[in-house]
Amino acid sequence: MIDGLKLGALAAVCVALATGGAAAQQVDSSYTNVDLDECTVIEADDFGARWACPGLKGIPVMIAEGDLRFFVSYGLKSTEEKAAAQTLPPFNHLGPRIEWRVSNAEGHWKPFATILRFFTQREEGEEENQILVVTKVQEGATCHVAYIDALANPDANELARQAADEAAPDFDCANEPEFVGAFEAWDIE
């Protein structure tokens, strides 16, 4: 026979497991393509260009290129966000897809972070590096949160999702992005 104390503890464990599973289902991924041919050219000159591209759930994507480096920001005021001025040190170009991390915590799916693969130049003749850039997406606080070296970490995609889910919501854009996992793409010292 189970006494009241044991029954109460069993009920608490069941509730914790049930709500833990529900909480885990509160975050998911959606994907959009990065195709500059599908974007609107905002400005272009000999030094670079800026495009407005379709995003997810009405959140536009601003992509800029200058000095052989790409900059990506999100939102209606994307050019005013810190992300609009953030890129990686080596010459780089973008991967073909944006992974949007979306939360249903407010009862509807809302993007709160993105993961975008940047390909960065190595020494001549070497394979390009691949860096996953995690960006917080929040009006007035859109910025790089974390960098993951996709070639140095076999679980790089999972590390990026974990950084997006755990660090992005409360990340202070006054801070520098974090390097997550092993990092060999360039000297970070």
Model-derived segments and spans:
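Charge-rich, low-complexity N-terminal segments
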Residues: 2-7, 20-85
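Bacterial N-terminal signal peptides
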Residues: 8-18
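Flexible, glycine- and charge-enriched loops at secondary-structure boundaries
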Residues: 58, 84-88, 153, 157
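Intrinsically disordered and other compositionally biased segments
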Residues: 10, 23, 106-108
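Short helix/strand-capping turn motifs
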Residues: 88-154
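C-terminal partner/receptor-binding element of secreted or periplasmic proteins
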Residues: 149-189
